[in-house]
């Protein structure tokens, strides 16, 4: 961001009631893909910003913003749906254990191996109240798959929702370019006396223009 690599990049894939993807501008600042980093205090709730990837440890420059609302999350079945999915997946994992098919199964279904049995009630409540995409969290994934969360939209979700509502083609690619003019790193000051370096929502969303 400081080098201006994100300037005039695009939100290249938009899926309403799910997420908006952007920031595809080549390799990472390390010059190569870097490893996933999961934390049981950072979650893919609505407004969370996370690294896009194409598999384990393939993070580069692209990111996404979770856009799913609490209402959509509830309508999709919420925790009951995720728990049912996990019951099915963990049975398959047990069947594939110590099998050459396990690696292939994880590659295909890794993100869905979300161990709802290990998720604290406080985290479940967080998703119920805010929405988001819980199964993308790596901290509670049984096979170490997921997406690295590194920021949170604190202001401007109306802009995220507007981007998510843009007209797209059959592959969820916006018909008109949605341009990220720039991203700036600012110091976010909470109402308390503590401070933390973060990418604020203004840095991510407000400079973005639709059209």
For the regions a language model picked out, list residue spans one by one.
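Cyclophilin-like peptidyl-prolyl cis-trans isomerases
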Residues: 1-211
């Amino acid at each position: 961001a400081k080098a201006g690599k994100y300037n005039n990049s695009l939100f290249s894939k938009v899926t309403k009631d799910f997420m908006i993807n952007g920031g595809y501008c080549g390799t990472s600042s390390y010059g190569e893909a870097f490893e996933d980093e999961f934390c049981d205090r950072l979650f893919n709730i609505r407004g969370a910003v996370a690294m896009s990837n194409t598999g384990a440890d393939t993070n580069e420059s692209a990111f996404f913003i979770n856009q799913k609302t609490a209402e959509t999350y509830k309508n999709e079945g919420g925790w009951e749906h995720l728990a049912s999915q996990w019951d099915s997946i963990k049975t398959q994992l047990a069947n594939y254990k110590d099998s050459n098919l396990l690696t292939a199964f994880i590659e295909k279904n890794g993100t869905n191996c979300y161990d709802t049995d290990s998720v604290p009630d406080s985290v479940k409540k967080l998703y119920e109240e805010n929405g988001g995409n819980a199964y993308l969290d790596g901290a509670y994934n049984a096979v170490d798959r997921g997406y690295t969360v590194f920021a949170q939209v604190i202001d401007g979700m109306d802009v995220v929702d507007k981007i998510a509502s843009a007209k797209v083609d059959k592959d969820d690619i916006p018909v008109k370019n949605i341009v990220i003019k720039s991203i700036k790193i600012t110091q976010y000051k909470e109402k308390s006396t503590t401070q933390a370096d973060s990418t604020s929502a203004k840095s991510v969303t407000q400079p973005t223009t639709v059209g």
